[in-house]
Amino acid sequence: MQEKIIILDFGSQTTQLIARRVRELNTYCEIVPYNKFPHNDPSIIGVILSGSPFSVYDESAFKVDLSDIRGKYPILGICYGAQFMSYTNGGKVEPAGTREYGRAHLSTFDQENPLLKNVREHSQVWMSHGDTITAIPENFKIIASTDKVAIAAYQIKEEKVWGVQFHPEVFHSEDGTQLLKNFVVDICGGKQDWSAASFIETTVAELKAQLGNDKVVLGLSGGVDSSVAAVLLNKAIGKNLTCIFVDHGMLRKNEFKNVLHDYECLGLNVIGVDASQKFFSELAGVEEPEKKRKIIGKGFIDVFDEEAHKIKDVKWLAQGTIYPDCIESLSITGTVIKSHHNVGGLPEKMNLKLCEPLRLLFKDEVRHVGRELGMPEHLITRHPFPGPGLAVRILGDITPEKVRILQDADDIYIQGLRDWKVKDSDGNETSLYHQVWQAGVILLPVQSVGVMGDERTYERAVALRAVTSTDAMTADWAHLPYEFMAKVSNDIINKVKGVNRVCYDISSKPPATIEWE
């Protein structure tokens, strides 16, 4: 049985980062809503309480009874989690005189405390809170302070319960990983035995037990997630897996043909379906982004339903859903941020059970699994691409001509990123493509005046988008070389009929999302 850390999510934007940091310690963890602790799970070895956008004294704040957890498992509260435990045990939490956001340094701390083992003196930590603990209960002790925060960290005396008002999961906390290692490995006893290989071994065994001799259909998109899911399932159930790759007409240039070839080389049983005319017809005149996503999602259901009925006795629908898909589709408060193609809707109409073997993995973990499975590097390192394809990179309504323009521009941009060689941090040669997390071109709903030769033009503008990230939860715009952008801009304007202006998007996430729609 795989031991795990449970992270109780109180709605923090950095909850996913906590999970990533724990998994980087080769220890498995799961995030569950703050009020859904799995009390009957014998594999739990420790609990982390996340931050929250609420104040602990707000009537609407998320609150939970920890009496059945405390004393049974080691607990680490982060930010709100720390404030919540202090407040509910009789401590005081009040609005800070000055809001604490950004860098701070540990001015005093108990170096003998197991949570702070090997944490350096004056180590930088990252603060992000508007409230602060002003008094702790009698059975609590302060174990760290900063210049402005007297109670930066505490421990409940004689208990394996700690709280920190800073964020060890954030990169800017210099010894944050060490602190988390102290908790996960030394205090909770984590064996650090979770890896891509162990995930494959466990998941294949679970899939065999779950699926038995049932037949499964899986929707391939050409992306990393569905491809790795397919190879993993193929390893578990072989010929009982049938993959369906639908061309909705909004794939990248030549993608349908190239991806089908890749899948055949992997030994997958794949059916390719050209449904482009159906999608173009149903999307005609539709401009609103969410409507476009819904139409494409429904279109996939229709095509899948038709193809699945041609296969006898199919019982399961498999998808390449990963963690960020689930988090962006539904927040802890139930507010829809953006509908994801992979989340919701499909199994209900098709009357199939749902299988999502990668649902609890982050993107980089999916790639590690793909490498462990022996998949070719060009498939594993492909940039993320939205399920609705170029439809959400065309602002406004969709037409075959707009798709043609965007395909041509995108092909020039992506190939340019692949061809432009640079040195990585270790001095090894790589390409710009492998230095960015995701890139693409957006066709803007505007036209602008230009001059080509001696003639005035009035043609479309496109925006280039490239971001750096590790998990898609946050992202920064990529600082591409000016020489590269000048070349790509020139190539697009000269080679793509209908475009006379190229812009570059320098928005980070948040506040923007990676995709424009």
Swiss-Prot record:
Q: Which residues form the active site?
A: 79, 167, 169
Keyword line:
ATP-binding, Glutamine amidotransferase, GMP biosynthesis, Ligase, Nucleotide-binding, Purine biosynthesis
One GO cellular component term of this record is: cytosol
Does this entry carry the keyword Nucleotide-binding?
yes
Give binding positions for ATP. 221-227
Query: Which Gene Ontology MF annotations are present?
Result: ATP binding; GMP synthase activity
- Domain named GMPS ATP-PPase is located at 194-382
Domain Glutamine amidotransferase type-1 span(s) in chain numbering: 4-193
Q: What class of enzyme is it?
A: ligase
Tell me the PROSITE patterns matching this sequence.
GATASE_TYPE_1, GMPS_ATP_PPASE
| Family annotation (Gene3D superfamilies) | 3.30.300.10, 3.40.50.880, HUPs (3.40.50.620)
Top-level taxon of the source organism: Bacteria
Q: Pathway, per Swiss-Prot/TrEMBL?
A: Purine metabolism; GMP biosynthesis; GMP from XMP (L-Gln route): step 1/1
By its UniProt entry, which InterPro entries does this protein fall under?
Class_I_gatase-like (IPR029062), GATASE (IPR017926), GMP_synth_C (IPR001674), GMP_synth_GATase (IPR004739), GMP_synthase (IPR022955), GMPS_ATP_PPase_dom (IPR025777), NAD/GMP_synthase (IPR022310), Rossmann-like_a/b/a_fold (IPR014729)
Q: Which reaction does it catalyse?
A: XMP + L-glutamine + ATP + H2O = GMP + L-glutamate + AMP + diphosphate + 2 H(+)
Which EC number(s) does the record attach to this protein?
A: 6.3.5.2
Q: What does this protein do?
A: Catalyzes the synthesis of GMP from XMP.
Q: Which NCBIfam families match?
A: guaA_Cterm, guaA_Nterm, PRK00074.1
Q: Which PANTHER family match?
A: GMP SYNTHASE [GLUTAMINE-HYDROLYZING] (PTHR11922:SF2), GMP SYNTHASE-RELATED (PTHR11922)
- HAMAP family associated with the record: GMP_synthase
Query: What assembly does the database describe for this protein?
Result: Homodimer.
The entry's protein name is GMP synthase [glutamine-hydrolyzing]
**Organism expressing this protein natively:** Phocaeicola vulgatus (strain ATCC 8482 / DSM 1447 / JCM 5826 / CCUG 4940 / NBRC 14291 / NCTC 11154) (Bacteroides vulgatus)
Encoded by which gene?
guaA
